């Protein structure tokens, strides 16, 4: 049975209005996106730029075009040499929560969920090493006890999720935790032991979480081990070199990072992989960690690809 002419006209009109609305939203998203990234280049107006990029309201519009930009950018990135080891200083969870009117614990949870997304993107691009800075030794002494306890609970949940995650086992991802584990509560240690044991035989990808981590402490531990071995005669003085020190670090069984990314606009290293990142390329973005998008990751990789690595020369 044919529909009445009036209903056909109405359907066509609604379809046209829907198309115009989608075009308008797409234009608005692209404009906001371009404006945000342009503003971030100018230090004097970082405040409004950061709000645009990190606002959960603005981001809901921007994200509609972000996927399109990510696909185009990914095509370019995948056609060039990729970093083999990406390290990330995941910063900005608490500021994201504050700007969004949320409790700090919810900001940390949003950061956990973002890490799961980023792992997907890294696996998709076949980048074999991903290392993230989750908790420093300074955080343990400087954070309030209730926030630390909430973080510890989140780490237990995250590690347990990883141990059961189909992506981990399907992609042969070895999960490791580096840091002063003796500073962590028993429930976190149990979760670490379980997850590391379940993934210890995997070797296609390595995902390292730095917990209770401090690079100076790591180097001190390595030096102490070398000194002890030299004292008992098992290590000759002439054998002490960069390779000997590197292999004694908590991260000694993996290559140095090629690219170190830090979110939230802070431009400092914060005692993270000091020895290992001597020749790494650094990329800083004003985006808070929970707002970090696939496009942000791809832009970091593209910036890395556009640099000429000199390795100290």
What are these regions (language model features)?
Residues 2-11, 15, 19-313:
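Flexible, compositionally biased loop and terminal segments
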């Amino acid at each position: 049975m044919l529909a009445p002419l009036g209903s056909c006209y109405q359907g066509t009109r609604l379809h046209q209005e829907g198309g115009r609305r989608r075009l308008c939203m797409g234009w608005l998203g692209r404009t906001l996106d371009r404006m945000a990234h342009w503003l971030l280049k100018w230090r004097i107006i970082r405040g409004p730029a950061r709000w645009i990029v990190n606002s959960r309201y603005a981001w809901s519009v921007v994200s509609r075009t972000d996927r399109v930009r990510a696909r185009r950018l990914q095509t370019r990135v995948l056609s060039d040499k990729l970093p083999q080891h990406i390290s990330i200083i995941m910063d900005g969870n608490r500021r994201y929560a504050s700007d969004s009117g949320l409790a700090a614990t919810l900001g940390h949870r949003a950061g956990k969920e973002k890490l799961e997304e980023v792992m997907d993107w890294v696996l998709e691009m076949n980048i074999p090493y991903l290392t993230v800075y989750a908790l420093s030794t300074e955080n343990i002494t400087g954070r309030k006890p209730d926030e630390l306890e909430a973080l510890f609970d989140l780490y237990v949940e995250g590690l347990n999720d990883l141990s059961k995650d189909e992506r981990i086992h399907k992609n042969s991802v070895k999960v490791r935790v580096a840091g002063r584990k003796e500073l962590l509560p028993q429930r976190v240690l149990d979760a670490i032991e379980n997850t590391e044991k379940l993934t210890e035989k995997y070797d296609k990808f390595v995902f390292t979480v730095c917990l209770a981590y401090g690079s100076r402490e790591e180097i001190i531990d390595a030096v102490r081990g070398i000194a002890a071995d030299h004292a008992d005669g098992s290590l000759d003085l002439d054998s002490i070199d960069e390779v000997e020190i590197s292999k004694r670090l908590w991260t000694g069984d993996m290559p140095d990072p090629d690219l170190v990314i830090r979110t939230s606009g802070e431009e400092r290293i914060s005692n993270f992989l000091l020895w290992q990142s001597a020749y790494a390329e650094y990329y800083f973005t004003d985006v808070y960690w929970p707002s970090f998008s696939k496009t942000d990751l791809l832009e970091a990789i593209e910036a890395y690809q556009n640099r000429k690595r000199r390795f100290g020369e």
